[in-house]
Amino acid sequence: MRLIIVSGRSGSGKSTALDVLEDNGYYCIDNLPAGLLPELAERALIHTELAQPLVAVSIDARNLPSHLSRFPELLEDVRAKHIQCDVLYLDADEETLLKRFSETRRRHPLSNANRSLAEAIQDESALLGPIADLADLKINTTHLNLYQLRDTIKLRLLNQPEPGTAFLVESFGFKRGMPVDADLVFDVRCLPNPYWKPELRAQSGLDQPVAEYLAAQPEVEEMYQDIYTYLYKWLPRFAASNRAYVTIAIGCTGGHHRSVYLTERLGQALQKTLKNVQVRHRDLS
């Protein structure tokens, strides 16, 4: 049995996450009272006719505060039944959440006559703290549209060929902000920038002319070797510590050239020595 617990602040994309999981064969329950989590797991184990039942539940601020505060012990109870259980926590910055509520005109579950929307969003963080602290995977949706979020969930949760730590090597551009869910961040903005070559500007690190230009730069090769040596040594230690997900982010200015090139090379090299290595380019349209 596999159980995925989806949580996060209102407006972060939980409904989209459940939709993706349902489309991929999961039996989904929205707004499950957290106190029922062990009972749900027990019943799914006993009564299901499926060899590998897939269940996803959403647990969020609509729960009783007393249930949310007990989440650590409830999760421990579920995992004691030898159930594969992943906790997915979605979030976005407060400005983005405020904008999303303004656009949809939906009421925040914690807002009332004495509490503004901004205060409700802040209070929600405290309520969901016990879940966020135990999340196996955190996805920040600030810069993701609906389709990018769906693709990210499928990539990180559903496309693992084998059990074990899932590694994501991700390129990004600093001008759009660092990925807040990254475990390791490497800044490669000091390297020669193909952007300043007019014939390369419109291309990306996936294109052969850009790759050839960067491969010819000694500093780029030195940077690649240093990052690869570090990852080759230390990523197995992350896996040995029972980490479910590890994100390695490579950043340049715009996220189109240098970071993309290095991310591709590192991903391909790591796939030869580690299981479950995926590659993603955040800022390529």
Swiss-Prot record:
Belongs to the RapZ-like family. Displays ATPase and GTPase activities. ATP binds at G8, R9, S10, G11, S12, G13, K14, S15. GTP binds at D60, A61, R62, N63. SUPFAM superfamilies: P-loop containing nucleoside triphosphate hydrolases. Keywords: ATP-binding, GTP-binding, Nucleotide-binding. GO terms for molecular function: ATP binding; GTP binding. InterPro entries: P-loop_NTPase, RapZ-like, RapZ-like_N, RapZ_C. It holds the Pfam family PapZ_C. This is Nucleotide-binding protein Pfl01_0854. It comes from the Bacteria.
